[in-house]
Design a protein with these regions (language model features):
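Membrane-entry segments of alpha-helical transmembrane domains in multi-pass membrane proteins
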Residues: 1-13, 34-39, 79-96, 134-147, ...
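Transmembrane helix-loop-helix hairpins at membrane boundaries of multipass inner-membrane proteins
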Residues: 1-10, 20, 24-123, 197-224, ...
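Central hydrophobic cores of alpha-helical transmembrane segments in multi-pass inner-membrane proteins
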Residues: 10-28, 41-54, 97-110, 128-129, ...
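Alpha-helical multi-pass transmembrane bundles of energy-transducing inner-membrane proteins
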Residues: 32, 124-221, 309-310, 314
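Alpha-helical transmembrane segments and their helix-start/interface "positive-inside/aromatic belt" motifs
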Residues: 33-47, 173-185, 359-365
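Juxtamembrane/interfacial segments at transmembrane-helix boundaries in multi-pass membrane proteins
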Residues: 56-83, 150, 164, 168, ...
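Internal transmembrane alpha-helices of multipass membrane proteins
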Residues: 66-163, 182-184, 256-260, 264, ...
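Aromatic-capped, Gly/Pro-kinked transmembrane alpha-helices
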Residues: 77, 269, 311-385
Length: 385
């Protein structure tokens, strides 16, 4: 039992290894059969489930917890830590997500194994499983934020799996934007908590953002902030959690008219992000407990935030159309410019060296290098401006 708990980090590395195998198989033109790759993937998922079950028995039935931290990024007065934290909450979510991920992979194999890009689907599912495990074993809110970003990327890739489908592409873009809004808001909350922990409490060690110290951090922030400001901050925390709950509903609004098996897999995967929202709510519960009867004001602020988001959403669609037109114009202009340069250099080589293949290739490469240099210079100047 202790072996599984001491090596619980394998819950992160094993799905990543499967992703590497699937990615390498794509580089060698999918020479490995789908059945073999699925066998590897489901075996790893079952091994991870065994680790999660052992951790569940260790923390729930034996009433024990495990915590480890190591410095990852050190600044002048701020240190960021990564590590592992297992308690009753984390192991419960690990076990639940492990069971659901195994069922999802089995369903995808039974129903979608004849899909030409099934290996890519399997890669995205393992990437999502890796990120979900990372959220649940994180010892602090900063590490959870990092894995929330990976969850957002995996969700975008899965929704946009059939990128030739315009409905799926629209759903992927909207899901990605909503994820970025939620994750950037979470980053704001992380930096706010870190500011109060470091500046006012002089916490520069692993306790500054640790879940084990969240009660003290919440009480300290509540005492330092004014009452309206604390209500607003808790409203932002609740906004982040609600955005995670809305992930499945966002996909439902853009779900394709044909209810395919792939859309069911994607919907089930998006619904699993709700687990991450529940987990975040339980970890940040000390802030909501300290609100007391100010919950009414929190709900009012939350409603105003979503009203603002709805207005921005109405403006977002025309903005996307405009940016799509600009992007198309820029891409076509660059392609035409590149073609013009290559033709010019090929003409020069025919005049100077009789147009043999080697000279044509050399001058074409020179033209491409000049194009890349032009784009790079333009990009640098644009940043400076």
């Amino acid at each position: 039992m202790e072996f599984f708990v001491e090596n619980i980090n394998l819950l992160l590395f094993l799905p990543l290894i499967v992703c590497a195998i699937l990615g390498f198989n794509g580089l060698i033109s999918n020479r490995v059969e789908k059945n073999t790759l699925f066998s590897i993937s489901i075996a790893v998922a079952l091994i991870c489930l065994i680790f999660a079950g052992a951790a569940f028995d260790y923390s729930v039935f034996n009433n024990m917890s495990v915590s480890s931290n190591f410095p990852w990024l050190a600044l002048d007065n701020i240190n960021f830590y990564l590590g592992t934290y297992l308690d009753k909450i984390s192991v419960s979510f690990l076990l639940g997500s492990g069971v659901l991920c195994v069922l999802l992979q089995v369903f995808a194999f039974l129903k979608l194994k004849d899909t030409p890009d099934f290996n890519r689907l399997l890669l995205y599912l393992n990437l999502f499983y890796f990120a979900l495990n990372g959220i649940f074993i994180s010892p602090n809110i900063f590490q959870s934020y990092l894995f929330f970003e990976i969850v957002g990327v995996a969700a975008y890739l899965l929704i946009n799996f059939d990128f030739s489908n315009r409905d799926e592409s629209k759903a992927a873009i909207k899901s990605f934007v909503f994820n970025r809004i939620g994750d950037l808001t979470l980053l704001f909350c992380v930096l706010t908590i870190l500011y109060y922990a470091v500046v006012y409490n002089q916490l520069t060690d692993a306790n500054s953002l640790s879940y084990t110290n969240m009660n003290n951090v919440s009480a300290s922030i509540n005492s330092l902030m004014s009452e309206p400001l604390f209500v607003f901050f808790c409203s932002i925390l609740m906004f982040v959690i609600v955005m995670k709950f809305m992930q499945a509903f966002i996909y439902l609004t853009f779900e394709p008219k044909e209810n395919t098996l792939l859309s069911k897999v994607i919907l089930f995967q998006n619904a699993m992000i709700t687990l991450a929202g529940v987990y975040l709510f339980m970890r940040l519960n000390p802030f909501f407990v300290d609100l007391g009867f100010d919950w009414v004001w929190t709900l009012l602020v939350l409603a105003l935030m979503f009203l603002t988001l709805g207005v921005l959403n109405k403006l977002f669609i025309p903005f996307c159309k405009m940016m799509g037109w600009i992007e198309k114009y820029v891409v076509e202009s660059v392609i035409n410019f590149a073609e013009l340069l290559i033709r010019a250099f090929s003409y020069i080589c025919t005049k100077l060296q009789a147009g043999n293949f080697q000279s044509y290739l050399i001058y074409s490469l020179i033209g491409l290098v000049l194009i890349f240099a032009f784009v790079l210079i333009f990009y640098v100047l644009l940043i400076k401006v």
